[in-house]
């Protein structure tokens, strides 16, 4: 008699089959750390555009990868892993040495990067900071209310990149415009929609939910004590 496998066992077996190709594993490994445009992925992996498009298409059709339009350059798309799609298959990619500090960057340093740094403080002992490419005069009121609702550490005043970044920082952009304005600056990119554009509480809740999920996923994947210098 054939064994009657559970739905979850069948799901994980199918995922292992999809990830049997080294190129797809490499794509998933990179996206586990950072959202990326197809051109960024191709450059990192050395894959021809048609071959990359094939593998991304397979991953997208099976609900592992999603595409979305940039909030900055509307001609540009970003690829990201679908939350929970790879649960149970151990496909998070290799760990990395802990940096001296994690710095979150957005354009105005008034919402997303502030919330990301505050969320990071709650789950990781690694030092953190936030900055903006064009800092606003003050933190968005919606971000302050969201931080209070979720009992996050107090948010700081908006600061510019030049006043914050030092050698050894691990930079994560949480804003498409900032990522595109300073190519090569960030070690990682999270394409988080700008809640200030909508301005309502739901927008800030959605942004913070995505940030908290990604912070919780990233923090334990740094290994060892923080590096210095």
Question: PLM ranges: what are they?
Answer:
Residues 56-57:
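Short, hydrophobic-biased segments on the C-terminal half of alpha helices
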Residues 10-51, 77-84:
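N-terminal helix-turn-helix DNA-binding core of bacterial DNA-binding proteins
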